[in-house]
């Protein structure tokens, strides 16, 4: 994939933009690592920040921080989908080592062969590397990315000293629920404080939950047959659950230990339509979408919020 193509920003992303404003992507739309384009409502400021980084990384990575399910990863993948930009996506965890990103020897048809990892492939071929939940990974391992983030060659001693010089279109994204400084809220078990030198190599943008109007458009794109009145009520419920999750206005901190992400909201809407006609359909769908994994007291609290918002729609009277 070497041939590039210019894309009109307004037409490609469905946003208002200066006439003639273009962004560079790839001409080949057949690469298997290009994400599948899905209905998506781009937020102008976030789109601008990601496109600016894609245009000129300046020796940086881009760290996207925000609450769970706010759309950090989908923002990047849906931009990539529209620019025909292949993506190497990895979900990090506490036991992941740098070798899993660079590559390692594996047994292939009875022979030991070196297989390049997502970092090596992305750097070599000009793909996007997305490190999902990067703040779950051991900071000592992530620090091994410092040099390549600055444009230095990736040297692989295990493969005979192979040297991979980063492709000019190679970009590194990392997502996390923290800003690299650990989790002071206690809501995200497993998050680790990251190495300061590693974080210093990233630009940082905050991806919060969409505004109600944007979120309404997202839900209606995904579930167009659901009445707008019901979607509006679902969004009000989601907003209240999130407020209690982050502890807004509460001196005692968070009152809920789970939240309603945009993807959970879409799931609730989809299930409500799928179970249309069932008794107490919105409660039934909400339980499957979110509250079945909540503590009983928190489940009751969320259902009470929903009942107050939905009124007679929650439990229709005979």
Task: Describe the function of each predicted region.
Residues 1-318:
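C-terminal regulatory/interaction module of P-loop NTP-utilizing enzymes
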């Amino acid at each position: 994939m070497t041939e590039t193509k210019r894309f009109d920003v307004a037409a490609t992303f469905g946003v208002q933009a200066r006439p003639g404003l273009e962004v560079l992507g790839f001409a080949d739309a057949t690469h298997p690592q290009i994400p599948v384009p899905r209905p998506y409502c781009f937020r102008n400021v976030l789109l601008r920040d990601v496109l600016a980084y894609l245009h000129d990384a300046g020796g940086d990575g881009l760290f996207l921080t925000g609450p769970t399910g706010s759309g950090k990863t989908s923002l990047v993948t849906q931009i990539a989908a529209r620019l025909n930009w292949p993506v190497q996506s990895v979900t990090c965890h506490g036991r992941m080592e740098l070798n899993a990103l660079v590559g390692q020897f594996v047994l292939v048809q009875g022979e030991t062969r070196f297989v390049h990892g997502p970092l090596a492939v992305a750097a070599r071929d000009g793909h996007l590397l997305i490190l999902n939940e990067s703040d779950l990974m051991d900071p000592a391992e992530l620090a091994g990315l410092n040099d390549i983030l600055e444009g230095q060659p990736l040297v692989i001693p295990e493969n005979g000293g192979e040297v991979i010089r980063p492709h000019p279109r190679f970009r590194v994204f990392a997502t996390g629920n923290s800003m690299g400084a650990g989790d002071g809220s206690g809501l995200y078990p497993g998050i680790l404080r990251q190495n300061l030198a590693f974080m210093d190599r990233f630009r940082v943008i905050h991806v919060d939950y969409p505004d109600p109007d944007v979120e309404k458009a997202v839900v209606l794109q995904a579930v167009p047959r659901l009445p707008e009145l019901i979607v509006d009520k679902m969004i009000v419920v989601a907003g209240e659950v999130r407020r209690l999750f982050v502890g807004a206005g509460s001196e005692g901190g968070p009152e809920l230990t789970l939240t309603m992400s945009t993807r959970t909201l879409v799931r609730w809407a989809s299930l409500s339509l799928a179970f249309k006609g069932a008794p107490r359909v919105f409660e039934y769908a909400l339980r499957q979408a979110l509250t079945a994994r909540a503590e009983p007291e928190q489940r009751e609290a969320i259902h009470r919020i929903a009942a107050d918002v939905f009124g007679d729609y929650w439990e229709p009277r005979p």
